[in-house]
Amino acid sequence: MIQTEFEFTLPKGYLDGEGNLHRKGVMRLSRAMDEIVPMRDPRVKSNPAYATVIILSRVITHLGALDDVSPAVIENLFACDLSYLQKFYRNINGLEEEDEV
């Protein structure tokens, strides 16, 4: 059976409005629609980099005590955590470039 969900721990963590820190989460493998749907979003049309925010909010199934990881949550991550999640996403989905021999 193929593994479709992967646990992660953010370097710093998401600090919510109540001061709670959320570091551990789960990301599922991406499907084609996870990368297609954001392209229809007006925020992505005006700023293509925003696709990353939407894609991550679609594939992170939970983060700490949060069951709903919205684009607003991703927008409020520390930069190092966003970078970590982008690398984690590429790694679990087999999108990392391999070194040439």
Residue ranges of predicted features:
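Short, surface-exposed, charged amphipathic helix/loop patches that serve as local interaction elements
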Residues: 1-101
